[in-house]
């Protein structure tokens, strides 16, 4: 009886072990950590231009003025743990200075922000090993749509959350709304990663694979925020070594860690489909054998 249970357990864990080996092989072949480092560098270069473009778009719509403030606090509180206040102060100063630039400088900001979009596109299609290129005009339209519609959708979601907060006076809905608001960052990350893995690759991505990969990435991202904040609080080595400049390495490490999570979710999404194809091919070979 015990031997039978052990055999069943081995039979069930064997596919998982094979999938994990395939995942590790793909991570190694794609140089995932190197790609994450490249994206982290481009992200830091594009961070201020991207934020400047986003909030310039909000400034063009007066009805989003209150939402713009909420979005700013939400981004720095949920996407830059522990040192979000310091980084927010510096970035807001940089953005304020960028508002004084000429039209040529503003175009440079937009180009730099689009450079980040292109780098993300290139990295994800490298992981999917897609050789099919989009037309340049189509790519530019997609990048511009992300720059314009992305912040507006985020602002709309924050407006909804603000509306939910306004309903907390109803005692019957208090617990439900608290639970919804507690998981709201996780849901937002999940949806964002799912859209990223579904839209950016130039080949068709199975929806269920994108959902699973996005969910794992969202969980790791939320856990990473808490773990990184705990590390900065409990082991303040960066502050001791760098002093007031500690915000620079802390920001870079966090951005690098974030891109590792994003690319790992992409690798998981790809590996799910690849493992399924390999399994089907192996079963087909067994059926063809006499």
Curated annotation (Swiss-Prot):
Protein origin, superkingdom: Bacteria
UniProt-listed InterPro entries: UPF0761_bac, Virul_fac_BrkB
Gene Ontology CC, one term: plasma membrane
Compartments in which it is found: Cell inner membrane
Membrane topology: Multi-pass membrane protein
Keyword list, A-Z: Cell inner membrane, Cell membrane, Membrane, Transmembrane, Transmembrane helix
Transmembrane segments: 44-64, 104-124, 140-160, 183-203, 210-230, 244-264
Main location class: membrane
Cross-referenced Pfam families: Virul_fac_BrkB
Family: Belongs to the UPF0761 family.
PANTHER family noted in UniProt: INNER MEMBRANE PROTEIN YHJD (PTHR30213), UPF0761 MEMBRANE PROTEIN YIHY (PTHR30213:SF0)
Protein name: UPF0761 membrane protein YihY
Gene: yihY
């Amino acid at each position: 009886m015990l031997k039978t249970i052990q055999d069943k357990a081995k039979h069930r864990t064997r596919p998982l072990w094979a999938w994990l080996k395939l995942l590790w092989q793909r991570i190694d072949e794609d140089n995932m950590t190197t790609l994450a480092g490249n994206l982290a560098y481009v992200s830091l270069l594009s961070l201020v231009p991207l934020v400047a473009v986003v909030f310039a778009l909000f400034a063009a719509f007066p009805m989003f003025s209150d939402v713009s403030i909420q979005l700013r606090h939400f981004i720095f509180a949920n996407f830059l743990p522990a040192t979000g206040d310091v980084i927010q102060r510096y970035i807001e100063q940089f953005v304020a200075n960028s508002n004084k630039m000429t039209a040529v400088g503003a175009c440079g900001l937009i180009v730099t922000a689009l450079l980040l979009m292109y780098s993300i596109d290139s990295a994800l299609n490298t992981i999917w090993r897609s050789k099919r290129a989009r037309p340049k005009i189509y790519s530019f339209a997609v990048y511009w749509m992300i720059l314009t519609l992305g912040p507006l959708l985020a602002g709309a979601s924050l407006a909804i959350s603000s509306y939910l907060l306004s309903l907390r006076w109803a005692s019957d809905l208090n617990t439900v709304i608290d639970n919804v608001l507690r998981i709201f960052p996780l849901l937002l990350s999940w949806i964002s990663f799912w859209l990223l893995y579904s839209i950016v690759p130039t080949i068709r991505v199975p929806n269920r694979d994108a959902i699973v990969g996005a969910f794992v990435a969202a969980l790791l991202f939320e856990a990473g925020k808490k773990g990184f904040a705990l590390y900065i609080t409990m082991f303040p080595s960066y502050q001791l070594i760098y002093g007031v400049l500690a915000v620079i390495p802390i920001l870079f490490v966090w951005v690098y860690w974030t891109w590792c999570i994003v690319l790992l979710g992409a690798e998981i999404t790809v590996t799910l489909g690849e493992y399924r194809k390999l399994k089907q091919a192996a079963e087909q070979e067994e059926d063809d054998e006499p």
